[in-house]
Amino acid sequence: MSFFNFRKIFKLGSEKKKKQYEHVKRDLNPEDFWEIIGELGDGAFGKVYKAQNKETSVLAAAKVIDTKSEEELEDYMVEIDILASCDHPNIVKLLDAFYYENNLWILIEFCAGGAVDAVMLELERPLTESQIQVVCKQTLDALNYLHDNKIIHRDLKAGNILFTLDGDIKLADFGVSAKNTRTIQRRDSFIGTPYWMAPEVVMCETSKDRPYDYKADVWSLGITLIEMAEIEPPHHELNPMRVLLKIAKSEPPTLAQPSRWSSNFKDFLKKCLEKNVDARWTTSQLLQHPFVTVDSNKPIRELIAEAKAEVTEEVEDGKEEDEEEETENSLPIPASKRASSDLSIASSEEDKLSQNACILESVSEKTERSNSEDKLNSKILNEKPTTDEPEKAVEDINEHITDAQLEAMTELHDRTAVIKENEREKRPKLENLPDTEDQETVDINSVSEGKENNIMITLETNIEHNLKSEEEKDQEKQQMFENKLIKSEEIKDTILQTVDLVSQETGEKEANIQAVDSEVGLTKEDTQEKLGEDDKTQKDVISNTSDVIGTCEAADVAQKVDEDSAEDTQSNDGKEVVEVGQKLINKPMVGPEAGGTKEVPIKEIVEMNEIEEGKNKEQAINSSENIMDINEEPGTTEGEEITESSSTEEMEVRSVVADTDQKALGSEVQDASKVTTQIDKEKKEIPVSIKKEPEVTVVSQPTEPQPVLIPSININSDSGENKEEIGSLSKTETILPPESENPKENDNDSGTGSTADTSSIDLNLSISSFLSKTKDSGSISLQETRRQKKTLKKTRKFIVDGVEVSVTTSKIVTDSDSKTEELRFLRRQELRELRFLQKEEQRAQQQLNSKLQQQREQIFRRFEQEMMSKKRQYDQEIENLEKQQKQTIERLEQEHTNRLRDEAKRIKGEQEKELSKFQNMLKNRKKEVINEVEKAPKELRKELMKRRKEELAQSQHAQEQEFVQKQQQELDGSLKKIIQQQKAELANIERECLNNKQQLMRAREAAIWELEERHLQEKHQLLKQQLKDQYFMQRHQLLKRHEKETEQMQRYNQRLIEELKNRQTQERARLPKIQRSEAKTRMAMFKKSLRINSTATPDQDRDKIKQFAAQEEKRQKNERMAQHQKHENQMRDLQLQCEANVRELHQLQNEKCHLLVEHETQKLKELDEEHSQELKEWREKLRPRKKTLEEEFARKLQEQEVFFKMTGESECLNPSTQSRISKFYPIPSLHSTGS
């Protein structure tokens, strides 16, 4: 065991060294260097504090993040590295970073102006186009710098664009940004904020096949521009997770009101919001667009000055209005007054609130509907004595309007203070409207008063046709006239409205709106004629125009019996708010009683800012946007609920009148939005012209009930949702007549007046039948809202270019504001939850990627090790074989050498013996010759001896030489034979060794090929498993997102159910009070009708009263049952809707899961195909490798054979020469032998 393993087991040595980061200081307390001086907010991953450097006093935003481990610290290093590496005037700078006690402190440059979205919410309006241009230009510069440095921001939105006090912007929050290593590198992470996500980023939720690049930021920039133009991004009403499907499948979003914006702006958005990534412009291209050719940041400096201005708030309650209502409710009921028959429920305020129609009006009205307008006009003309004084009042008011407006225009350049009119000046005389320097008063309701009187004339004419006594008619006229005088005094309170004049035309339009609304039967031709004249107004509005708040106050004359009845038939306070500049006109949505004659005062407060006289005239509507919210869901506001119980007759008449009023209202509000007050050095005066409205004409009702188009306009001043261009009421509610309610009453209401002669009970039931249909649908909500409502007045004072400017805005604080704030808070919570989820997913993805990369590295290392091991094994075997062969050859050679030596010695010994024998034989031959010579004669003996010796010597020498040569040849032959045998043996051994070596090499290559194939299989299995792991994690993350989405949906549904339960509880609690008040009113009206038509005896009257009381009790019981049934239906419908939403959500989730599974199957199939192709290519390359190897083996065998053949032929080619071995053993020559 090595020492390191030993140390690991016993945990010896130091702990793992902490990783050091370049820009993060460790083990230093940041509070030693920075002082916390305040809290800026609570971010998604920690709190953000305002800090100041103790040495340099530099301010910073300190983001403190609690990190539980070093691994979590890694998640924030990308953000810190990006902040540290960026040096651009439009990107926040990193000032310091600490890691201390498991807290990561990131201190970045402090931007005192705050985020763009926070500024819009503070000012309660979007940015103007000039402001958007500056923000867009500087943001583009920052993005271009980031993209040039290979950085994708991935979370661009208004909340991450910060203002400085100098009017510049800085891009912040790089928490989910990506820093690439290559310019063309792409990303496939599903990360960012849903509303601003590009479609290609959304697609990465289920498919990683099409990664995205830097152009994803360009899409987010386009969405951010829409957000700055409309306060909220597109699809903001959707759940953060459900919006993803909308982005992926729908067309690119556009501006809600395109006509308000320049063509350059719209073209710029089109270039940004291009779903085709290749066609989408880059930041460098967008910088050349004419929309961003701006240099001055003055619009932003003005915006910041206003946002950071000193604000004084004043909260005003509506107590005075309640007192007026109580006074009105305490007035005596004229004999000629009675509950109206709901002639129309068009969207006018007077039609919704006034309910003082003449008695018997419904029947006579029905009779007269079939008549022509000429007859109606003639009846109106016949009533001149009744209308003289109101007409004079109208003329009087018009004169005062002109005076007040002219005086206002001459003094408009002075700073104007807003003075609350009704609280300080109670009941001034109608003939003496005050014209003061501090309070310009404009009577915008005088025309409406005249029209109201016309309606009253018509209704009184109808009364005269149905009454039988001239005395009773005179009494009614007298009471009517007295009531009008009282009403005129009341109207004086409400029409004396203090107006810091926006323009004379604005007041005119408001008057026109009221006049149109008061004329129930106004024909379309008259309306169009009036609109044609009114459309000639200017189209600029001063920036910083303060809010105008119109409130509707009225009480039904039929409800003036007691204070309890004051809550009966007040229409709903569903507000129609149209913002012109910063102008709000609150109008109830739908009213239950529309045919009455009571004038509805409109309280209109316009507060004018002090504006530099030499200021550019073209500063227009840009600083205060026109906003119109159009709700398309019926029943979402209390005012809309009224339509559920309205009668068929109401629908029939309303279908015409509402259409007329809609057109008039739409066009006039549009005109009002274009009005401007231009203040230049010449102080031009604007002439005043208020037109009288044409006389009232009643439109004959259609024979069939028609759908009613009622514009449901609701402004949310905080959110600015569903903005529409003012005047273009493109979205309306289609309200169909309720066919299932009281078919008998429908027949009665659509009759021709014959019911007037039958009985007073039936008559009164017919008249009052409409009243019961609207009580349970929130008819007193306006009054309750008025009691609860408060007006919040904000005054901002700031200095722009050395000029002090004061902007005063008024806003009615209602429950909807708190609900909007609550919804915004909940939406922020949902986005924060999503951000946490994305951070966890990113961390899990990084961990998985690291794990998979480690697995790949490990398997590739193992492959390499196995290959090296296998090669080493066979190389070792071959080496051993070669070593063994070498040793064998050496041993054989040694053996052969020894054998050759021994054989040569043996042969030499034998030859020496034979030579010795041969020499002995020659000696003996010599002796024989001597003996022969001795036998010869003595004299011849000497000579013969000599001759015979010479002959013998020559003969013996030749024989000996031949014998020795023969012996040498025999020796060489024997040795050569031995050598040949040795060579053959060596050749065999070498051939065998070569064969063995080649077999080993074949085995080595086969093993390598097998190993390669196995590695390919294992690599494929690993990649397949990794792909499954990746998709498993994607499915897991998708399911977690779906769980979170389902949880949010359930919370949302639960909120809806709770709201409905609370509303129904309030309605149930209100109903008994409404019924008691209504019962008193109806009983009083019934008794009065009995007194007027007193032809029966007192007993009969008492019986009728009892019968009426029984019918009333029955009717109230039916009302309670109808309300109960309605509540059950509402709850059932809501539950069904919630269930449908959940089903739809689950369906979308299942589609996403199915899509993910499809992608996984497709990727696995592609992986298998890639593996098959790779294996096929490998096998195709394997054949040439085998062939090459065999050819190499054959060549080596051939070379070996040639070598040994040549060696065999080269040895002993000349037998006469001594062999290589025998020459070392020389044969003794003749000289060595003695004689």
Curated annotation (Swiss-Prot):
Biological process per Gene Ontology, one example term: regulation of apoptotic process
Catalytic activity of the protein: L-seryl-[protein] + ATP = O-phospho-L-seryl-[protein] + ADP + H(+); L-threonyl-[protein] + ATP = O-phospho-L-threonyl-[protein] + ADP + H(+)
PTM comment text: Proteolytically cleaved by caspase-3.
Major place of residence: cytoplasm
Bias type Acidic residues, positions: 312-328, 638-650
Keyword check for ATP-binding: yes
Compositionally biased tracts (Low complexity): 749-760
PANTHER family, per the entry: NON-SPECIFIC SERINE_THREONINE PROTEIN KINASE, PROTEIN KINASE DOMAIN-CONTAINING PROTEIN
Functional description taken from the UniProt entry: Mediates apoptosis and actin stress fiber dissolution.
Protein name: STE20-like serine/threonine-protein kinase
Source organism per UniProt: Homo sapiens (Human)
